[in-house]
Regions:
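A short helix->loop->beta-strand "cap" motif at the edges of active sites that frequently abuts
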Residues: 106, 127, 185-188, 213
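PLP-dependent aminotransferase-like
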Residues: 44-45, 73, 100-160, 173
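Conserved active-site segment immediately N-terminal to the catalytic lysine
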Residues: 204-225
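Generic structural signal for small/hydrophobic residues in well-ordered secondary structure
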Residues: 23-26, 71, 84, 108, ...
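Short, solvent-exposed loop/turn segments at secondary-structure junctions
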Residues: 26-30, 91, 115, 164-166, ...
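N-terminal small-domain helix-loop-helix segment of the aminotransferase-like
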Residues: 2-89
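Hydrophobic/aromatic beta-strand patches that form the interior of the parallel beta-sheet core
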Residues: 19-21, 31-32, 109, 130, ...
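Active-site phosphate-binding strand-loop segment of PLP-dependent enzymes
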Residues: 136-202, 209
Length: 227
């Protein structure tokens, strides 16, 4: 098994830290630790005092229960916090989901262009990957009729990215429901990378987890939260 490197990450690893002006960054302006701790109206002293008393043990191997409960509140569905997994970033979450769901010979449909691990990892795992292309003439949205033509009785997984990286396309609630209907017609899972979810008006944005029972969604605190 061979995993391809992420080309843009390879380039950034070499160039981003020495750049005078960084126009390739994919997050909002980063917060300082002081700015982050001040969000609750305190100066951070209480946090550091408590941190000084913490023992350097393994901590929550299965993930902090409090963190999981707070994440569950971000969604409309009544989620069981035990179904929320803390991982090493959104890429790690995508990797874990794909390792569980994809087996050699599976048929996977991936939105394209998109964050390359969403199609390269399934391919490395031995899946047959087909692209569901965003179309310039549709203002860089996908065509649901194309997805209907691509899906097969043996389709295991549909990978989407909402909002899209790198295009920025936001899939409407109506489109997400149509995707869910297509996936349900063959019993496929949907993996939705929602790392740029809060970039859209959060009142109008809908998560795939609130729409489809066989959805797995991933997110991170590194992009729009800049933590």
């Amino acid at each position: 098994m061979e995993f391809k490197t992420i080309g843009c990450e390879d380039w950034l690893n070499v160039n981003e830290h020495d750049a005078v002006w960084d126009i390739a960054q994919s997050t909002i302006s980063s917060l300082t630790m002081g700015e982050l701790l001040a969000l609750d109206g305190k100066d951070g002293a209480t946090f550091y005092e408590r941190l000084n008393d913490e023992k350097m043990n393994y901590g929550w191997i299965e993930g902090s229960a409090e963190f999981k409960e707070e994440v569950a509140k971000l969604y409309k569905k009544d989620l069981d916090p035990r179904n929320i997994l803390q991982t090493n970033g959104c890429t790690g979450a995508n990797m874990n989901a794909l390792l569980v769901l994809v087996k050699p010979g599976d048929h996977v449909i991936a939105e394209w262009p998109t964050y390359s691990p969403l199609y390269e990892i399934p391919r490395s795992l031995g899946a047959e990957v087909e692209y569901w292309e965003l179309k310039e003439e549709l203002d860089w949205a996908p065509d649901i009729e194309d997805l209907k033509r691509l899906v097969r009785p043996d389709t295991k997984l549909i990978c989407i990215n909402n909002a899209s990286n790198p295009i920025g396309t936001v899939l409407s609630s109506d489109m997400l429901r149509q995707i869910a209907d297509v996936a349900a017609s063959v019993g496929a899972y949907v993996l939705c990378d929602e790392v740029y979810l809060p970039m859209e008006d959060t009142d109008a944005y809908e998560s795939m987890i609130d729409i489809y029972d066989k959805a797995v969604v991933t997110n991170s605190v590194s992009k729009t939260y800049s933590v």
